[in-house]
UniProtKB/Swiss-Prot annotation:
Pfam families per the UniProt record, alphabetical: SNO
Protein name: Pyridoxal 5'-phosphate synthase subunit PdxT
Pathway: Cofactor biosynthesis; pyridoxal 5'-phosphate biosynthesis
Annotated family: Belongs to the glutaminase PdxT/SNO family.
Reactions catalysed: aldehydo-D-ribose 5-phosphate + D-glyceraldehyde 3-phosphate + L-glutamine = pyridoxal 5'-phosphate + L-glutamate + phosphate + 3 H2O + H(+); L-glutamine + H2O = L-glutamate + NH4(+)
Annotated active site: 78, 170, 172
Signal peptide limits: none
Function: Catalyzes the hydrolysis of glutamine to glutamate and ammonia as part of the biosynthesis of pyridoxal 5'-phosphate. The resulting ammonia molecule is channeled to the active site of PdxS.
Molecular functions (GO terms): glutaminase activity; pyridoxal 5'-phosphate synthase (glutamine hydrolysing) activity
Length: 196
């Protein structure tokens, strides 16, 4: 399996490390040609406005949207969650707009307000998951087609819709591989669907 990792900014190496640990290959996505032959795509955290402009500059925005409509599994963390959303509060930035969600940016404040805590995520099993939030966004509202995997104080922090997965936290900064394993299961389901 080959998983593309958007390499314009953010924790690219950290995502690569976990995907490799799980026994799969990665490819850095910098240009549209890099998208050829990938089985899934990860959008790492970073600064969402900058990343959105770079997606346009490097000609990646439209090809990624097209792949999303073709059901390619896409996983966004932190700013990746923002990019996947159709609606971003107080922002006109470019976005992929693939998930029926309404997002608030920098919801947990500045760098100093960032934090780490263990939270139960039932879909990942009984052991609480170490969530790391860095100037994290959250999903304020979600349409019916969105499955909420984790919420806290009415803020949606982890969700999926069809082939898309979005987390407001940074699973790539932990040693716990369960979120990435869950995404890989999405890819395997997609591959089975394609082979029907």
């Amino acid at each position: 399996m080959k998983i593309g990792i958007l390499a314009l900014q953010g924790a690219v190496r950290e995502h690569c490390r976990i995907v490799h640990k799980l026994g799969h290959k990665t490819v850095d996505i910098l240009y549209p040609r890099d998208l050829i032959g990938i089985d899934g795509l990860i959008l790492p955290g970073g600064e969402s406005t900058t990343i959105s402009k770079l997606l346009v500059r490097y000609g990646l925005l439209t090809p990624i949207v097209e792949l999303g409509h073709k059901k390619l599994p896409i996983f966004g963390t932190c700013s990746g969650l923002i990019l996947l959303s159709k609606n971003i509060a107080k922002s006109e930035q470019y976005r992929l707009g693939l998930m029926d969600t309404y997002v608030k940016r920098n919801a947990f404040g500045r760098q100093l307000a960032s934090f780490e805590t263990k939270m139960p995520i039932p879909i990942l099993g009984n052991i609480p998951y170490p969530t790391i939030f860095i100037r994290a966004p959250y999903i304020d509202k979600a349409d019916k087609g969105v499955n909420i995997l984790l919420s806290h104080e009415s803020r949606i922090l982890f969700a999926e819709q069809d082939n898309f997965l979005a987390a407001s936290f940074h699973p790539e900064l932990t040693e716990d591989v369960r979120v990435h394993e869950y995404f890989i299961q999405k890819i395997l389901s997609y591959q089975k669907f394609c082979n029907l």
